[in-house]
Structures are given as C-alpha cells and as structure tokens.
Amino acid sequence: MTKSLTNMNITNKKVLLRADLNVPLENSVITDDNRIKAILPTLKYLVQQKAKVIIFSHLGRVKTEADKAHFSLQVVAEKIAFYLQQKLKFVPETQGNTLNQAVGQMLPGDVLVVQNTRFEDVPFKKESKNDPELGKYWASLGDVFVNDAFGTCHRTHASNVGIATYIKEKCFGFLVEKEISFLKKIVQTPQRPLVAVLGGSKVSDKIGVIRSLLQKVDVLLIGGGMSYTCLKAKCFNIGTSLLEADKIPLVKELLASPEGKKIVLPKDFVCGKEFSPTTQAAVYSYDNISDDVMGLDIGPQTIELFKTYLQTAQTVVWNGPVGVFEFEQFSKGTKALAETISNLSPNTTTIIGGGDSAAAVFKFGLDQNFSHISTGGGAFLEFLEGKPMPGLACMEKL
C-alpha cells in the first residue's frame, strides 16, 4: 500500500514532484491553467512542510530541436510563482551541472522547476521510452518522490516510472489520491442508478471503455461523432456525418450483446451542410437525415431524453462532448447536459472525464458544480477500461 503524503517525513528533504503541467498554449500564452491550479494543494503542502520541491513535467509534443522554442516550461513556472506568491527558480535544462548546482543550493521551502522533460525525447526519446539512466539520474536529485500527475499514469516514462524505480521513499500527491478515490467509486462501489455519457468523435478510441462500462452501468448514453457509426450499424442513413466504417461490425456486436440494451442513442440531431460555425443549422430525426448534411450536435428531443435518465441517477460519469461545442449553434446539446448534470442533487456523484468534456464545462462556467473533474483524458479512460496503469503500479514497488 502506498503511503499517504501526510504520513511522509519531508521536512528539509529534496522532494521530486511529478506534476501534469501540460497546459494549452497560444503564442506562448497559457489559455487554460486548470492543471496548474489542480496541483496547488500538494505543492502548497510541500512548501509549508519546508520541503525542497523540485518539479518535473512535460509540455506539448517535442519531436525536433525547433519544437523546444515553443514548449519551454518557463511560462508555466512563472504562473506557479504567481499562484504560490513566492519566487521560484526555473532551470532551463533537464540534466547537467546547472541543474545539479541549483538543486544543491536549495533551502527548505524553495521551489525549483526543471525544464520540460520531453526535451529529453530529442533525439532518442529518452523520456517517453523510460531510459533507465535518465530515470536513475533524476531520482538521484531527490530523497522523496511524489507522483501527482494522474494524466500520465497510463504512460511508462522516465519522469514517473523511471524515477519511482530508483527511489525508495515515494507516495501519491493529493490530486492523484482524489482521482483514484472518485474513479474507484465508479469501478467498485457506485451508487445506483449509474449513468454514463460518452461523446467525442471516434468510437474507435472508446470501444474498450464501452465494453467495460456496459458491465458496470445501468444506462449508457452515447452522443457526439461516435453516435453516427452506431446509427449506421443499425442501417440508418447518416448523410455526410462522421463514420468509421471499419468499426461497424464491432458496433453491431456491442449493440446485439445482452448488455447492448443499456445503450441509448440520440433520437434527433442538429445538422449542417459543412463543418463550419456559419453553416445553416437544421434539426433532423435519426431516421430521416438527408444525404447532404452532417450531424454536429444532438437535437432537442435527445436533450430531453438524456435528461430523463440523468435526473434519476445517483452516479454520473461523462466523457466527451455530444456536439461541436466550439461552434455556438452546435453547442446546445453539450451545454444542456452540463447544466443538467451540474444541477443534480448534491448527493449525486458527478464525475467529468478530462479532455474536451472538461474544457466544455469550464467554458460554460459550470466547473464548481461537479463532484470531480478529472485532469486525465487518456488516463481516465484507461482506468475505467481496467487497463494496467504503470504510473500507479510503480509506486507500490520498492
């Protein structure tokens, strides 16, 4: 059993904190800092306990030397300093004398941010392939390892599994503990009825989680791009809507299975002739979609249908928007579901998966009304699917 952070002796210790600070950037400006806010409880606790905190995180996809100019963690370090209201040190390197010296000069309560761990992916992918020498080196910088990056717990990287392999004293941060606690409520001990909502564009991304959820949920509401492949599998015309034709046999199998009766598909759609915010929108029944239009949102009948299921739920888990919420006229379905779920009884456990569904909830200003909003998109789905989670498993081993 992994120790709790509050039971660790961290005063005056060098604590390696793996955080998920992979925030979206536009022209080197952070457009959504919720992942930074999410680690503040752990970070503030470490500072209050007078630990010497050394933060590791990745940012973006770094495949070439040129990419490095766009994905420095310096802008993230500045935002952390703002929220902590204290100075911290940013080291623009991932290893070497400058980093070694900076760590050696730290005082209790100091915070240091190491450069983007994915800089080590150029050119040999040392971070992403969990290079043992890199993991061993990073581990040598600290006394204690705190993993608070749930968003990477489904990955085997040098900055999570690698460090954990070479350091004895380790634990999860408060964020990861919270993520695991809420996800176990779905997987192990849900209050029923348990209603899941799955959206997003591709059914192929979620076949595994659909199979897993059908064993656990009472109702599975499916919307978004993936619903059109489901309709096509039932031999309905979907016009020019998104289709994964190669997944039709799999979807037919799921719909025909004993658990398939738990699946509820949309009854109508808001469609347009083009994937554009200005295309003319019109509502079509699921069995009467024209050849020249594509579905871009669930329709008003479906909103009401989904509401009836959600309003009876004791546990709700939602991953993936049910429409193109970035376009105003195709955002009504996603917004209506977000409002419905956020207005459920405080006794109802409501959990939002990471990624676009979380982005939608924040966009609509409803983020305070959910029991939990996960910081991990892929990790969230893989946990629900029951896949191995290397970033969690490695914390149990000495």
UniProtKB/Swiss-Prot annotation:
Keywords on record: ATP-binding, Cytoplasm, Glycolysis, Kinase, Nucleotide-binding, Transferase
Which principal EC class is assigned to this enzyme? transferase
Q: Which InterPro entries does the record associate with it?
A: Phosphoglycerate_kinase, Phosphoglycerate_kinase_CS, Phosphoglycerate_kinase_N, Phosphoglycerate_kinase_sf
Task: Work out whether the entry's keyword set contains Coiled coil.
Answer: no
Q: Which residues bind substrate?
A: D20, L21, N22, R35, H58, L59, G60, R61, R118, R155
Q: What is its EC number?
A: 2.7.2.3
Stretches of the chain forming a coiled coil according to its record: none
Q: List the disulfide bonds.
A: none
Pathway(s) this gene product operates in, as recorded in its UniProt entry: Carbohydrate degradation; glycolysis; pyruvate from D-glyceraldehyde 3-phosphate: step 2/5
Q: What's one GO-annotated cellular component?
A: cytosol
Subcellular localization, as worded in the UniProt entry: Cytoplasm
Q: Where is the signal peptide?
A: none
Q: Which reaction does it catalyse?
A: (2R)-3-phosphoglycerate + ATP = (2R)-3-phospho-glyceroyl phosphate + ADP
Q: Which GO terms describe its molecular function?
A: ADP binding; ATP binding; phosphoglycerate kinase activity
Please tell me where ATP binds in this chain.
K206, G295, E326, G354, G355, D356, S357
UniProt similarity note: Belongs to the phosphoglycerate kinase family.
Q: What is this protein called?
A: Phosphoglycerate kinase
UniProt organism field: Onion yellows phytoplasma (strain OY-M)
